[in-house]
């Protein structure tokens, strides 16, 4: 999904954070030329999943809750940057806050995601 939508994962700016960017183009915009809300959520959920997997290698991390507020539209041609910060790092739950901004640094979406951390099953 990340390749299909054009996500690019970036180096981590500080501990317990992760960052990615995505150019708004025909892969992730809706018919009016704006970034799709679904693509925005996919960016946030992929980023929080990558963050949880980095914190818990050898575990399975699955999203169990997503809450978002889209506060500003982004037109095709712009690039959005998502920065995820972990709010809670428990044994079985991670709570992430993701802020997505446009190239001017304006807030586009604020997303909160809860990931459930599972042990890998033994076969």
Summary of predicted features, one role per range:
Residues 4-35:
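Catalytic strand-loop segment that frames the active site of acyl-thioester-processing enzymes
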Residues 22-24, 70, 117:
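Hydrophobic residues in beta-strands and at strand termini
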Residues 32-49, 53:
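Compact, glycine-rich, soluble single-domain proteins
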Residues 3-5, 16-18, 37, 60-66, ...:
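A generic structural signal for short beta-strands and their flanking turns/coil linkers
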Residues 74-76, 81, 85-123:
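HotDog/MaoC-like acyl-thioester-processing domains
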Residues 50-81, 86:
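Hydrophobic beta-strand-centered segment that forms part of the acyl-chain substrate-binding groove
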